[in-house]
Protein backbone atom coordinates (compact mmCIF):
# COMPACT_ATOMS: atom_id res chain seq x y z
CA UNK A 1 0.00 0.00 0.00
CA UNK A 2 1.58 3.36 -1.03
CA UNK A 3 2.66 6.05 1.40
CA UNK A 4 1.74 9.71 0.95
CA UNK A 5 3.55 12.92 1.88
CA UNK A 6 2.11 12.99 5.42
CA UNK A 7 3.59 9.56 6.06
CA UNK A 8 0.16 7.97 6.33
CA UNK A 9 -1.26 5.31 4.10
CA UNK A 10 -4.52 5.76 2.17
CA UNK A 11 -7.52 4.27 3.96
CA UNK A 12 -10.53 2.86 2.18
CA UNK A 13 -13.90 3.21 3.86
CA UNK A 14 -15.82 5.37 6.27
CA UNK A 15 -14.56 7.43 9.17
CA UNK A 16 -15.90 5.82 12.32
CA UNK A 17 -15.67 9.07 14.27
CA UNK A 18 -17.89 10.98 11.86
CA UNK A 19 -20.16 8.39 10.24
CA UNK A 20 -23.15 7.14 12.14
CA UNK A 21 -25.08 5.52 9.29
CA UNK A 22 -24.64 1.76 8.93
CA UNK A 23 -22.35 0.85 6.06
CA UNK A 24 -20.81 -2.28 4.63
CA UNK A 25 -17.62 -0.27 4.08
CA UNK A 26 -15.04 -1.01 6.79
CA UNK A 27 -14.35 1.72 9.32
CA UNK A 28 -11.14 3.71 9.02
CA UNK A 29 -8.68 5.01 11.58
CA UNK A 30 -9.49 8.42 13.02
CA UNK A 31 -6.71 10.19 11.13
CA UNK A 32 -8.20 9.54 7.69
CA UNK A 33 -8.98 12.59 5.54
CA UNK A 34 -11.83 10.86 3.74
CA UNK A 35 -15.16 9.58 5.00
CA UNK A 36 -18.18 8.14 3.28
CA UNK A 37 -21.47 9.55 4.65
CA UNK A 38 -25.00 8.53 3.80
CA UNK A 39 -27.12 11.25 5.45
CA UNK A 40 -27.64 13.30 2.27
CA UNK A 41 -25.61 16.28 3.46
CA UNK A 42 -22.79 17.60 1.30
CA UNK A 43 -19.43 17.07 2.98
CA UNK A 44 -15.92 17.65 1.68
CA UNK A 45 -14.85 14.40 3.34
CA UNK A 46 -17.07 12.69 0.75
CA UNK A 47 -15.90 14.92 -2.05
CA UNK A 48 -12.62 14.61 -3.94
CA UNK A 49 -10.93 17.99 -4.21
CA UNK A 50 -7.17 17.46 -4.59
CA UNK A 51 -5.91 20.96 -3.85
CA UNK A 52 -2.18 21.56 -3.95
CA UNK A 53 0.31 23.71 -2.12
CA UNK A 54 2.17 26.44 -3.95
CA UNK A 55 4.93 24.70 -5.89
CA UNK A 56 8.49 25.96 -5.94
CA UNK A 57 8.81 28.61 -8.61
CA UNK A 58 5.06 29.31 -8.40
CA UNK A 59 3.95 31.39 -11.41
CA UNK A 60 0.47 32.35 -10.21
CA UNK A 61 1.68 35.87 -9.31
CA UNK A 62 4.12 36.27 -12.20
CA UNK A 63 5.04 39.91 -12.92
CA UNK A 64 2.43 41.06 -10.43
CA UNK A 65 -0.34 39.34 -12.43
CA UNK A 66 -2.56 36.60 -11.08
CA UNK A 67 -2.48 33.46 -13.22
CA UNK A 68 -6.02 32.10 -13.02
CA UNK A 69 -5.06 28.90 -14.83
CA UNK A 70 -2.40 28.02 -12.26
CA UNK A 71 -4.96 28.60 -9.51
CA UNK A 72 -7.47 26.30 -11.24
CA UNK A 73 -4.84 23.57 -11.16
CA UNK A 74 -3.86 24.19 -7.54
CA UNK A 75 -7.48 24.44 -6.39
CA UNK A 76 -8.18 20.99 -7.81
CA UNK A 77 -10.70 22.00 -10.48
CA UNK A 78 -8.77 20.48 -13.36
CA UNK A 79 -5.63 18.66 -14.44
CA UNK A 80 -3.68 18.85 -17.67
CA UNK A 81 -3.51 15.73 -19.83
CA UNK A 82 -1.48 17.11 -22.74
CA UNK A 83 -0.83 20.43 -24.42
CA UNK A 84 -4.20 22.16 -24.71
CA UNK A 85 -6.12 19.18 -23.26
CA UNK A 86 -7.55 19.17 -19.72
CA UNK A 87 -9.54 16.89 -17.42
CA UNK A 88 -12.27 18.44 -15.27
CA UNK A 89 -12.26 17.19 -11.67
CA UNK A 90 -15.34 17.22 -9.39
CA UNK A 91 -15.09 20.89 -8.35
CA UNK A 92 -14.52 21.99 -11.94
CA UNK A 93 -17.40 19.87 -13.15
CA UNK A 94 -19.72 21.50 -10.61
CA UNK A 95 -18.79 24.91 -12.04
CA UNK A 96 -19.32 23.69 -15.60
CA UNK A 97 -22.67 22.08 -14.71
CA UNK A 98 -23.91 25.34 -13.21
CA UNK A 99 -22.85 27.30 -16.29
CA UNK A 100 -24.71 24.79 -18.46
CA UNK A 101 -27.85 25.03 -16.32
CA UNK A 102 -27.75 28.82 -16.58
CA UNK A 103 -27.38 28.54 -20.36
CA UNK A 104 -30.28 26.06 -20.46
CA UNK A 105 -32.45 28.61 -18.67
CA UNK A 106 -31.82 31.31 -21.24
CA UNK A 107 -32.01 29.01 -24.24
CA UNK A 108 -35.39 27.80 -22.98
CA UNK A 109 -36.51 31.44 -22.83
CA UNK A 110 -35.88 31.57 -26.59
CA UNK A 111 -37.91 28.44 -27.26
CA UNK A 112 -34.81 26.46 -28.21
CA UNK A 113 -34.69 22.66 -28.07
CA UNK A 114 -31.55 20.94 -26.79
CA UNK A 115 -29.69 18.41 -28.94
CA UNK A 116 -26.39 16.55 -28.81
CA UNK A 117 -24.56 16.07 -32.09
CA UNK A 118 -21.76 13.60 -32.71
CA UNK A 119 -18.17 14.76 -32.34
CA UNK A 120 -17.39 13.00 -35.63
CA UNK A 121 -18.27 14.92 -38.78
CA UNK A 122 -18.00 13.78 -42.38
CA UNK A 123 -15.43 15.59 -44.50
CA UNK A 124 -17.89 15.39 -47.39
CA UNK A 125 -20.23 17.82 -45.63
CA UNK A 126 -17.41 20.27 -44.97
CA UNK A 127 -16.34 19.99 -48.59
CA UNK A 128 -19.91 20.71 -49.68
CA UNK A 129 -20.06 23.89 -47.59
CA UNK A 130 -16.67 25.03 -48.88
CA UNK A 131 -15.05 25.19 -45.45
CA UNK A 132 -12.69 22.24 -45.79
CA UNK A 133 -10.22 23.81 -48.21
CA UNK A 134 -7.40 25.86 -46.74
CA UNK A 135 -8.06 24.83 -43.13
CA UNK A 136 -6.34 21.44 -42.99
CA UNK A 137 -4.03 22.41 -40.16
CA UNK A 138 -6.94 23.30 -37.85
CA UNK A 139 -8.59 19.89 -37.92
CA UNK A 140 -8.09 16.61 -36.14
CA UNK A 141 -8.71 14.25 -39.06
CA UNK A 142 -9.17 10.49 -39.13
CA UNK A 143 -10.12 7.66 -41.46
CA UNK A 144 -12.11 4.52 -40.69
CA UNK A 145 -11.39 0.98 -41.91
CA UNK A 146 -13.52 1.62 -45.01
CA UNK A 147 -11.40 4.70 -45.80
CA UNK A 148 -14.25 7.09 -45.10
CA UNK A 149 -12.79 10.37 -43.88
CA UNK A 150 -13.97 12.23 -40.79
CA UNK A 151 -12.86 15.06 -38.58
CA UNK A 152 -13.40 15.91 -34.94
CA UNK A 153 -15.86 18.77 -35.21
CA UNK A 154 -14.68 22.25 -34.25
CA UNK A 155 -18.27 23.39 -34.95
CA UNK A 156 -21.46 21.87 -36.33
CA UNK A 157 -23.01 24.16 -38.95
CA UNK A 158 -22.74 21.53 -41.66
CA UNK A 159 -24.20 18.70 -39.62
CA UNK A 160 -27.13 20.65 -38.19
CA UNK A 161 -27.96 22.12 -41.60
CA UNK A 162 -28.12 18.63 -43.11
CA UNK A 163 -30.34 17.36 -40.30
CA UNK A 164 -32.78 20.22 -40.73
CA UNK A 165 -32.67 20.01 -44.55
CA UNK A 166 -33.74 16.36 -44.35
CA UNK A 167 -36.62 17.09 -41.98
CA UNK A 168 -37.98 20.58 -42.68
CA UNK A 169 -39.67 21.41 -45.99
CA UNK A 170 -42.30 24.07 -45.29
CA UNK A 171 -42.33 27.56 -43.82
CA UNK A 172 -44.92 26.18 -41.39
CA UNK A 173 -42.12 24.22 -39.70
CA UNK A 174 -40.21 27.43 -38.95
CA UNK A 175 -38.91 29.23 -36.97
CA UNK A 176 -36.70 26.53 -35.46
CA UNK A 177 -34.11 26.99 -32.73
CA UNK A 178 -31.78 24.15 -31.75
CA UNK A 179 -28.83 24.20 -29.37
CA UNK A 180 -26.26 21.87 -27.90
CA UNK A 181 -23.50 21.96 -25.29
CA UNK A 182 -20.76 19.61 -26.46
CA UNK A 183 -17.03 19.11 -26.78
CA UNK A 184 -15.31 20.68 -29.79
CA UNK A 185 -11.83 20.17 -31.20
CA UNK A 186 -9.32 22.42 -32.91
CA UNK A 187 -5.65 21.60 -33.50
CA UNK A 188 -4.28 24.87 -32.14
CA UNK A 189 -0.75 25.58 -33.31
CA UNK A 190 0.12 27.14 -29.94
CA UNK A 191 -2.26 26.25 -27.10
CA UNK A 192 -1.94 28.77 -24.29
CA UNK A 193 -3.57 30.25 -21.20
CA UNK A 194 -5.10 26.95 -20.17
CA UNK A 195 -8.81 26.74 -20.93
CA UNK A 196 -8.74 29.98 -22.91
CA UNK A 197 -6.92 28.52 -25.90
CA UNK A 198 -7.11 24.74 -25.85
CA UNK A 199 -7.36 21.97 -28.41
CA UNK A 200 -10.45 20.44 -26.80
CA UNK A 201 -13.14 22.68 -25.36
CA UNK A 202 -16.82 22.77 -24.40
CA UNK A 203 -19.09 25.08 -26.38
CA UNK A 204 -22.73 26.01 -26.43
CA UNK A 205 -23.97 26.40 -30.01
CA UNK A 206 -27.43 27.72 -30.86
CA UNK A 207 -28.57 27.35 -34.46
CA UNK A 208 -31.58 29.34 -35.67
CA UNK A 209 -33.64 28.83 -38.82
CA UNK A 210 -36.12 31.35 -40.27
CA UNK A 211 -38.03 31.64 -43.53
CA UNK A 212 -37.12 35.25 -44.35
CA UNK A 213 -34.22 37.60 -43.76
CA UNK A 214 -36.29 40.07 -41.65
CA UNK A 215 -37.48 37.21 -39.45
CA UNK A 216 -33.90 35.98 -39.04
CA UNK A 217 -32.79 39.44 -37.94
CA UNK A 218 -35.59 39.56 -35.37
CA UNK A 219 -34.37 36.21 -34.09
CA UNK A 220 -30.82 37.54 -33.98
CA UNK A 221 -31.90 40.45 -31.79
CA UNK A 222 -33.79 38.10 -29.46
CA UNK A 223 -30.65 35.97 -29.10
CA UNK A 224 -28.57 39.07 -28.35
CA UNK A 225 -30.97 39.99 -25.56
CA UNK A 226 -30.77 36.44 -24.16
CA UNK A 227 -26.96 36.71 -24.13
CA UNK A 228 -27.18 40.00 -22.26
CA UNK A 229 -29.54 38.38 -19.74
CA UNK A 230 -27.17 35.41 -19.32
CA UNK A 231 -24.18 37.67 -18.68
CA UNK A 232 -26.25 39.85 -16.34
CA UNK A 233 -27.02 36.75 -14.25
CA UNK A 234 -23.28 36.26 -13.78
CA UNK A 235 -23.07 39.79 -12.30
CA UNK A 236 -19.73 40.47 -13.90
CA UNK A 237 -18.79 43.48 -16.05
CA UNK A 238 -18.81 42.60 -19.74
CA UNK A 239 -18.36 44.23 -23.13
CA UNK A 240 -20.41 43.78 -26.30
CA UNK A 241 -18.72 44.75 -29.56
CA UNK A 242 -19.44 44.67 -33.27
CA UNK A 243 -17.21 41.99 -34.76
CA UNK A 244 -15.82 40.37 -37.88
CA UNK A 245 -17.64 37.19 -38.94
CA UNK A 246 -14.43 35.66 -40.31
CA UNK A 247 -14.68 32.09 -41.59
CA UNK A 248 -18.21 31.67 -40.22
CA UNK A 249 -19.69 33.83 -42.98
CA UNK A 250 -22.32 36.56 -42.83
CA UNK A 251 -21.97 40.28 -42.18
CA UNK A 252 -23.74 40.80 -38.85
CA UNK A 253 -22.04 39.58 -35.69
CA UNK A 254 -21.28 40.63 -32.12
CA UNK A 255 -18.71 39.47 -29.60
CA UNK A 256 -19.14 39.28 -25.84
CA UNK A 257 -16.07 39.87 -23.69
CA UNK A 258 -14.69 40.21 -20.20
CA UNK A 259 -12.14 43.01 -19.87
CA UNK A 260 -8.76 41.44 -19.06
CA UNK A 261 -5.17 42.62 -19.21
CA UNK A 262 -4.29 39.15 -20.50
CA UNK A 263 -6.99 39.14 -23.19
CA UNK A 264 -6.05 38.49 -26.80
CA UNK A 265 -8.64 40.88 -28.25
CA UNK A 266 -8.72 44.67 -28.20
CA UNK A 267 -12.11 46.35 -27.89
CA UNK A 268 -12.48 49.97 -28.96
CA UNK A 269 -15.22 51.87 -27.15
CA UNK A 270 -16.35 55.46 -26.80
CA UNK A 271 -16.46 57.28 -23.46
CA UNK A 272 -19.61 59.16 -24.51
CA UNK A 273 -21.78 57.05 -26.83
CA UNK A 274 -22.42 53.29 -27.10
CA UNK A 275 -19.93 52.78 -29.94
CA UNK A 276 -18.03 49.52 -29.39
CA UNK A 277 -16.14 47.43 -31.93
CA UNK A 278 -13.41 44.82 -32.08
CA UNK A 279 -10.15 46.34 -33.26
CA UNK A 280 -10.17 43.84 -36.15
CA UNK A 281 -13.23 45.63 -37.56
CA UNK A 282 -12.20 49.21 -36.84
CA UNK A 283 -11.54 51.54 -39.76
CA UNK A 284 -11.54 55.28 -39.04
CA UNK A 285 -12.86 57.82 -41.57
CA UNK A 286 -10.54 60.63 -42.58
CA UNK A 287 -12.69 63.33 -40.99
CA UNK A 288 -11.99 61.79 -37.56
CA UNK A 289 -8.24 61.68 -38.08
CA UNK A 290 -5.89 62.38 -35.15
CA UNK A 291 -3.23 64.90 -36.06
CA UNK A 292 0.14 63.36 -37.02
CA UNK A 293 3.49 64.97 -36.22
CA UNK A 294 4.93 67.23 -38.90
CA UNK A 295 7.03 65.23 -41.36
CA UNK A 296 10.63 66.10 -42.14
CA UNK A 297 11.27 67.93 -45.42
CA UNK A 298 12.63 65.48 -47.96
CA UNK A 299 12.72 65.42 -51.76
CA UNK A 300 11.27 61.92 -52.09
CA UNK A 301 9.52 60.75 -48.89
CA UNK A 302 9.04 61.80 -45.25
CA UNK A 303 11.68 60.24 -43.05
CA UNK A 304 9.18 59.68 -40.23
CA UNK A 305 6.78 57.79 -42.44
CA UNK A 306 5.98 54.18 -41.68
CA UNK A 307 5.81 51.57 -44.44
CA UNK A 308 4.05 48.23 -44.77
CA UNK A 309 4.97 45.80 -47.55
CA UNK A 310 2.66 43.08 -48.84
CA UNK A 311 2.22 40.79 -51.81
CA UNK A 312 -0.95 39.33 -53.30
CA UNK A 313 -1.70 35.64 -52.89
CA UNK A 314 -0.97 35.01 -56.58
CA UNK A 315 2.38 36.88 -56.18
CA UNK A 316 1.61 39.22 -59.12
CA UNK A 317 0.84 42.36 -57.15
CA UNK A 318 2.96 44.28 -54.67
CA UNK A 319 1.62 46.75 -52.12
CA UNK A 320 3.55 49.54 -50.45
CA UNK A 321 1.41 51.23 -47.81
CA UNK A 322 2.62 54.31 -46.00
CA UNK A 323 1.35 56.23 -42.99
CA UNK A 324 2.58 59.49 -41.47
CA UNK A 325 4.53 58.45 -38.38
CA UNK A 326 6.09 55.04 -37.76
CA UNK A 327 6.81 55.76 -34.09
CA UNK A 328 3.26 56.98 -33.39
CA UNK A 329 0.84 54.90 -35.45
CA UNK A 330 0.47 51.20 -36.23
CA UNK A 331 -0.95 49.94 -39.52
CA UNK A 332 -4.54 48.72 -39.51
CA UNK A 333 -4.44 45.41 -41.38
CA UNK A 334 -8.23 45.38 -41.68
CA UNK A 335 -8.16 48.66 -43.62
CA UNK A 336 -5.41 47.33 -45.89
CA UNK A 337 -7.43 44.15 -46.56
CA UNK A 338 -10.54 46.16 -47.45
CA UNK A 339 -8.61 48.24 -49.98
CA UNK A 340 -6.34 45.44 -51.22
CA UNK A 341 -8.37 42.21 -50.74
CA UNK A 342 -5.74 39.97 -52.37
CA UNK A 343 -3.21 40.64 -49.61
CA UNK A 344 -1.30 37.63 -48.26
CA UNK A 345 -1.17 38.29 -44.51
CA UNK A 346 1.31 35.47 -43.82
CA UNK A 347 4.21 37.83 -44.56
CA UNK A 348 5.76 40.19 -42.04
CA UNK A 349 4.80 43.63 -43.33
CA UNK A 350 8.10 45.11 -42.23
CA UNK A 351 10.21 42.52 -44.10
CA UNK A 352 10.77 44.36 -47.38
CA UNK A 353 13.22 41.82 -48.79
CA UNK A 354 11.01 38.76 -48.20
CA UNK A 355 7.99 40.44 -49.78
CA UNK A 356 9.98 41.73 -52.76
CA UNK A 357 11.58 38.33 -53.36
CA UNK A 358 8.18 36.61 -53.34
CA UNK A 359 6.77 39.17 -55.77
CA UNK A 360 9.60 39.55 -58.27
CA UNK A 361 10.75 35.91 -58.34
CA UNK A 362 7.32 34.78 -59.48
CA UNK A 363 7.73 36.78 -62.68
CA UNK A 364 10.37 34.38 -63.97
CA UNK A 365 8.23 31.37 -63.09
CA UNK A 366 5.06 32.40 -64.90
CA UNK A 367 6.35 35.10 -67.28
CA UNK A 368 3.48 37.42 -66.35
CA UNK A 369 4.02 41.19 -65.87
CA UNK A 370 4.00 42.55 -62.35
CA UNK A 371 2.06 45.44 -60.83
CA UNK A 372 3.03 47.43 -57.78
CA UNK A 373 0.70 49.71 -55.87
CA UNK A 374 1.43 52.62 -53.57
CA UNK A 375 -1.21 53.18 -50.89
CA UNK A 376 -0.78 56.44 -49.01
CA UNK A 377 -2.54 57.56 -45.84
CA UNK A 378 -4.24 60.88 -46.57
CA UNK A 379 -2.37 62.55 -43.70
CA UNK A 380 1.01 62.00 -45.32
CA UNK A 381 2.63 65.21 -46.49
CA UNK A 382 5.59 65.92 -48.72
CA UNK A 383 5.02 62.87 -50.91
CA UNK A 384 4.76 64.59 -54.31
CA UNK A 385 8.33 63.85 -55.27
CA UNK A 386 7.95 60.24 -54.28
CA UNK A 387 4.75 59.92 -56.33
CA UNK A 388 6.57 61.03 -59.47
CA UNK A 389 9.47 58.71 -58.78
CA UNK A 390 7.05 55.80 -58.18
CA UNK A 391 5.12 56.27 -61.41
CA UNK A 392 8.28 56.52 -63.48
CA UNK A 393 9.43 52.97 -62.69
CA UNK A 394 8.55 50.56 -65.54
CA UNK A 395 10.97 47.71 -64.81
CA UNK A 396 12.96 46.24 -61.95
CA UNK A 397 15.94 43.82 -61.80
CA UNK A 398 14.88 40.17 -61.49
CA UNK A 399 16.62 37.47 -59.43
CA UNK A 400 18.80 36.48 -62.39
CA UNK A 401 19.76 40.06 -63.26
CA UNK A 402 17.23 40.41 -66.07
CA UNK A 403 14.73 43.26 -66.20
CA UNK A 404 11.16 42.45 -65.13
CA UNK A 405 8.48 44.74 -66.62
CA UNK A 406 6.27 46.38 -63.99
CA UNK A 407 3.47 48.90 -63.91
CA UNK A 408 3.45 51.33 -60.99
CA UNK A 409 0.13 52.68 -59.75
CA UNK A 410 -1.18 54.67 -56.80
CA UNK A 411 -4.22 53.40 -54.86
CA UNK A 412 -6.55 55.87 -53.15
CA UNK A 413 -6.98 55.23 -49.42
CA UNK A 414 -10.74 54.90 -49.80
CA UNK A 415 -13.42 52.34 -49.00
CA UNK A 416 -16.73 52.67 -50.84
CA UNK A 417 -15.55 56.05 -52.12
CA UNK A 418 -14.92 57.45 -48.63
CA UNK A 419 -11.38 58.36 -47.47
CA UNK A 420 -10.18 56.28 -44.51
CA UNK A 421 -7.13 56.09 -42.28
CA UNK A 422 -4.64 53.27 -42.67
CA UNK A 423 -3.73 53.19 -38.98
CA UNK A 424 -5.11 51.64 -35.82
CA UNK A 425 -7.04 53.55 -33.21
CA UNK A 426 -5.30 54.92 -30.14
CA UNK A 427 -6.59 55.99 -26.74
CA UNK A 428 -8.24 59.43 -26.88
CA UNK A 429 -8.65 59.42 -30.66
CA UNK A 430 -11.95 61.03 -31.73
CA UNK A 431 -14.94 58.68 -31.88
CA UNK A 432 -16.06 57.97 -35.46
CA UNK A 433 -19.68 57.65 -34.30
CA UNK A 434 -20.33 60.80 -32.28
CA UNK A 435 -18.93 64.33 -32.19
CA UNK A 436 -17.91 64.58 -28.54
CA UNK A 437 -16.49 61.22 -27.52
CA UNK A 438 -12.96 59.92 -27.20
CA UNK A 439 -11.95 56.34 -27.86
CA UNK A 440 -10.76 53.97 -25.17
CA UNK A 441 -8.94 50.72 -25.95
CA UNK A 442 -9.34 47.71 -23.66
CA UNK A 443 -7.79 44.27 -23.79
CA UNK A 444 -10.48 41.64 -23.46
CA UNK A 445 -11.19 37.91 -23.49
CA UNK A 446 -13.96 36.73 -25.81
CA UNK A 447 -16.48 34.42 -24.15
CA UNK A 448 -19.33 34.44 -26.68
CA UNK A 449 -20.20 35.31 -30.27
CA UNK A 450 -23.45 35.75 -32.21
CA UNK A 451 -23.48 35.40 -36.00
CA UNK A 452 -26.24 36.15 -38.49
CA UNK A 453 -25.37 33.69 -41.26
CA UNK A 454 -28.12 34.37 -43.78
CA UNK A 455 -27.95 31.71 -46.50
CA UNK A 456 -24.20 31.06 -46.13
CA UNK A 457 -24.86 27.37 -45.31
CA UNK A 458 -28.44 26.80 -46.43
CA UNK A 459 -27.64 27.45 -50.09
CA UNK A 460 -24.69 25.03 -50.54
CA UNK A 461 -26.35 22.48 -48.23
CA UNK A 462 -29.68 22.84 -50.09
CA UNK A 463 -31.76 23.73 -47.04
CA UNK A 464 -34.92 25.11 -48.65
CA UNK A 465 -38.59 25.36 -47.73
CA UNK A 466 -41.79 26.24 -49.54
CA UNK A 467 -42.87 29.72 -48.45
CA UNK A 468 -46.43 31.08 -48.17
CA UNK A 469 -46.43 31.73 -51.93
CA UNK A 470 -45.49 28.12 -52.63
CA UNK A 471 -41.98 29.11 -53.77
CA UNK A 472 -38.74 27.42 -52.78
CA UNK A 473 -36.59 29.73 -50.64
CA UNK A 474 -33.28 29.18 -48.86
CA UNK A 475 -33.62 29.26 -45.09
CA UNK A 476 -31.97 32.18 -43.27
CA UNK A 477 -29.77 30.95 -40.44
CA UNK A 478 -27.92 32.14 -37.38
CA UNK A 479 -25.20 30.57 -35.22
CA UNK A 480 -24.56 31.72 -31.67
CA UNK A 481 -21.83 30.38 -29.40
CA UNK A 482 -20.76 30.58 -25.76
CA UNK A 483 -17.44 29.10 -24.69
CA UNK A 484 -18.39 27.09 -21.60
CA UNK A 485 -14.93 25.86 -20.64
CA UNK A 486 -13.52 29.19 -21.81
CA UNK A 487 -15.84 30.95 -19.34
CA UNK A 488 -14.32 28.94 -16.50
CA UNK A 489 -10.81 30.07 -17.45
CA UNK A 490 -11.87 33.67 -18.10
CA UNK A 491 -13.72 34.07 -14.80
CA UNK A 492 -10.87 32.41 -12.90
CA UNK A 493 -8.50 35.05 -14.27
CA UNK A 494 -10.99 37.90 -13.83
CA UNK A 495 -11.79 37.31 -10.15
CA UNK A 496 -8.61 35.70 -8.80
CA UNK A 497 -6.49 37.48 -6.22
CA UNK A 498 -3.38 36.59 -4.27
CA UNK A 499 -5.40 34.33 -1.95
CA UNK A 500 -7.03 32.24 -4.64
CA UNK A 501 -9.97 31.99 -7.01
CA UNK A 502 -13.28 33.80 -6.84
CA UNK A 503 -16.64 32.80 -8.29
CA UNK A 504 -19.97 34.47 -8.97
CA UNK A 505 -22.77 33.02 -6.86
CA UNK A 506 -24.47 31.64 -9.97
CA UNK A 507 -21.65 29.24 -10.87
CA UNK A 508 -19.59 28.74 -7.70
CA UNK A 509 -18.79 25.06 -7.00
CA UNK A 510 -20.50 25.66 -3.64
CA UNK A 511 -21.98 29.00 -2.61
CA UNK A 512 -20.97 28.55 1.02
CA UNK A 513 -18.66 26.30 2.99
CA UNK A 514 -19.29 25.60 6.66
CA UNK A 515 -16.08 25.11 8.66
CA UNK A 516 -16.54 23.99 12.29
CA UNK A 517 -13.77 23.61 14.82
CA UNK A 518 -13.32 20.02 16.08
CA UNK A 519 -14.91 20.85 19.43
CA UNK A 520 -18.27 21.87 17.94
CA UNK A 521 -20.99 19.30 18.52
CA UNK A 522 -21.82 17.38 15.35
CA UNK A 523 -25.56 17.91 15.84
CA UNK A 524 -25.05 21.70 15.92
CA UNK A 525 -23.04 21.56 12.69
CA UNK A 526 -25.69 19.51 10.94
CA UNK A 527 -28.50 21.74 12.22
CA UNK A 528 -26.77 24.87 10.92
CA UNK A 529 -26.05 23.16 7.60
CA UNK A 530 -29.72 22.25 7.26
CA UNK A 531 -30.74 25.83 8.03
CA UNK A 532 -28.51 27.25 5.30
CA UNK A 533 -29.15 24.47 2.79
CA UNK A 534 -32.93 24.69 3.21
CA UNK A 535 -32.72 28.37 2.24
CA UNK A 536 -31.59 27.23 -1.24
CA UNK A 537 -27.96 28.14 -0.59
CA UNK A 538 -25.66 25.49 -2.09
CA UNK A 539 -23.60 24.57 0.97
CA UNK A 540 -21.01 22.01 1.97
CA UNK A 541 -19.39 21.10 5.29
CA UNK A 542 -15.62 20.93 5.55
CA UNK A 543 -15.42 18.03 8.00
CA UNK A 544 -12.01 16.81 6.88
CA UNK A 545 -9.60 16.13 9.71
CA UNK A 546 -7.30 19.02 8.98
CA UNK A 547 -6.15 22.04 10.96
CA UNK A 548 -8.50 25.05 10.91
CA UNK A 549 -5.83 27.24 9.30
CA UNK A 550 -5.40 24.73 6.49
CA UNK A 551 -9.17 24.59 5.90
CA UNK A 552 -9.52 28.38 5.80
CA UNK A 553 -6.64 28.69 3.34
CA UNK A 554 -8.14 25.91 1.25
CA UNK A 555 -11.50 27.71 1.17
CA UNK A 556 -9.78 30.88 -0.05
CA UNK A 557 -7.91 28.94 -2.72
CA UNK A 558 -11.09 27.32 -4.09
CA UNK A 559 -12.95 30.63 -3.95
CA UNK A 560 -16.26 29.85 -2.25
CA UNK A 561 -18.27 33.10 -2.13
CA UNK A 562 -19.05 32.65 1.59
CA UNK A 563 -17.16 30.95 4.40
CA UNK A 564 -19.09 30.28 7.61
CA UNK A 565 -16.83 29.53 10.60
CA UNK A 566 -18.17 27.82 13.71
CA UNK A 567 -15.51 28.59 16.28
CA UNK A 568 -15.03 30.21 19.66
CA UNK A 569 -17.98 32.60 19.24
CA UNK A 570 -20.29 29.63 18.77
CA UNK A 571 -19.30 28.11 22.08
CA UNK A 572 -19.69 31.47 23.86
CA UNK A 573 -22.89 32.89 22.30
CA UNK A 574 -24.01 30.74 19.36
CA UNK A 575 -22.52 33.25 16.92
CA UNK A 576 -20.67 32.62 13.66
CA UNK A 577 -17.92 34.30 11.70
CA UNK A 578 -19.10 35.07 8.17
CA UNK A 579 -16.41 35.74 5.57
CA UNK A 580 -16.80 37.09 2.03
CA UNK A 581 -13.41 37.73 0.44
CA UNK A 582 -14.70 39.46 -2.70
CA UNK A 583 -16.48 42.05 -0.53
CA UNK A 584 -13.64 42.18 2.02
CA UNK A 585 -16.05 41.24 4.81
CA UNK A 586 -15.31 39.27 7.95
CA UNK A 587 -17.99 39.74 10.59
CA UNK A 588 -19.77 38.07 13.47
CA UNK A 589 -23.42 37.15 12.96
CA UNK A 590 -25.97 35.26 15.00
CA UNK A 591 -26.93 31.83 13.72
CA UNK A 592 -30.52 32.96 13.23
CA UNK A 593 -29.35 35.79 10.94
CA UNK A 594 -26.80 33.99 8.80
CA UNK A 595 -29.20 33.11 5.96
CA UNK A 596 -30.59 36.63 5.63
CA UNK A 597 -27.09 38.12 5.79
CA UNK A 598 -25.79 35.80 3.05
CA UNK A 599 -28.83 36.68 0.93
CA UNK A 600 -28.19 40.39 1.48
CA UNK A 601 -24.49 40.23 0.64
CA UNK A 602 -25.01 37.96 -2.36
CA UNK A 603 -26.85 40.80 -4.11
CA UNK A 604 -23.52 42.65 -4.24
CA UNK A 605 -21.60 39.76 -5.79
Question: Predicted segment positions?
Answer:
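NTP/phosphate- and nucleic-acid-binding module
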Residues: 2-605
Amino acid sequence: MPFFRNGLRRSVGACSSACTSPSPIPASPKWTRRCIHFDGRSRLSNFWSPTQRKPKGDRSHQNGEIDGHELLLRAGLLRQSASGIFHLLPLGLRVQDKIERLIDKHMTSLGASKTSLSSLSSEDLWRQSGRLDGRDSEFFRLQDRKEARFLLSPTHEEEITKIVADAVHSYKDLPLRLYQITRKYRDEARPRQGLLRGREFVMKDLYTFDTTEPQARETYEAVRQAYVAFLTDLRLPYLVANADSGNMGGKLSHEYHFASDRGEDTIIGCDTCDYSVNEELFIAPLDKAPSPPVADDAPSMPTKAGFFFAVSKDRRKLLWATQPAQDVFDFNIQALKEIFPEIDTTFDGSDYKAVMDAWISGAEEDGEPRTRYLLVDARNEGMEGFFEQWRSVTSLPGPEGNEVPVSSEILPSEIDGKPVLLTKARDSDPCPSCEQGKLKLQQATEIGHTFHLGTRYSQPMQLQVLDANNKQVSVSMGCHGIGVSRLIGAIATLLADKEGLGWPMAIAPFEAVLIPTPSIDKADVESLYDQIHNAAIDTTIDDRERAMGWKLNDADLVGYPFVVVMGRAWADKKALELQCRRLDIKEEVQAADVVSRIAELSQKL
